[in-house]
């Protein structure tokens, strides 16, 4: 088993971005920055979070749940605590855990679900100071990723490993 310094883990959930638009996945070269990050770090090209809505992808990535015809687990009242998530696992191993979103995290019960299931901190729309652009789903991806980078740099200064789930929404619908 690995005995070195713990690696940081960042998962970027890019709303409505399919492989056909992502260069490193064999699609059109429309994502040069994502393509560059894929070359510098670990990028998984056989990961698929199924679902008919964004919240289904979120629950699949964080919990491993497969989609069901019922309401999303994130939205259910009794799922707001005690579900095992990747954040729980990493938190038990000394990681800082964080959800970063450009919109309002109370939407679809995300705030309650994440804080009750392993995420220690949430950054959402109210935490952005003078964003360059705010649309109907929240701040722009540029604002979101600048803030995410600031958070990563702060965690690095603290010398603690971190897990951050970054969820974009600016190209929703």
Feature names for model-found ranges:
Residues 1-173:
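Soluble catalytic regions of membrane-associated enzymes that act on cell-envelope
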């Amino acid at each position: 088993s690995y005995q070195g310094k713990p690696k940081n883990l960042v998962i970027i959930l890019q709303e409505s971005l399919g492989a056909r638009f992502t260069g490193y996945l064999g699609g059109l070269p429309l994502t040069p920055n994502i393509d560059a990050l894929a070359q510098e770090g670990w990028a998984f090209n056989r990961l698929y979070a199924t679902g008919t809505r964004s919240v289904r992808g979120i629950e699949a990535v964080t919990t491993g749940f497969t989609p069901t015809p019922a309401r999303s687990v994130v939205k259910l009242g009794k799922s707001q605590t005690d579900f095992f998530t990747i954040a729980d696992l990493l938190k038990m191993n000394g990681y800082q855990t964080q959800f970063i979103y450009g919109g309002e995290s109370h939407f679809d019960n995300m705030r309650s679900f994440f804080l009750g299931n392993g995420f220690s901190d949430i950054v959402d729309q109210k935490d952005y100071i003078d964003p360059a652009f705010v649309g109907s789903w929240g701040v722009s991806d540029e604002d979101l990723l600048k803030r995410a980078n600031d958070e990563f740099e702060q965690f690095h200064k603290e010398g603690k490993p971190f897990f951050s789930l970054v969820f974009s929404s600016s190209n929703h619908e």
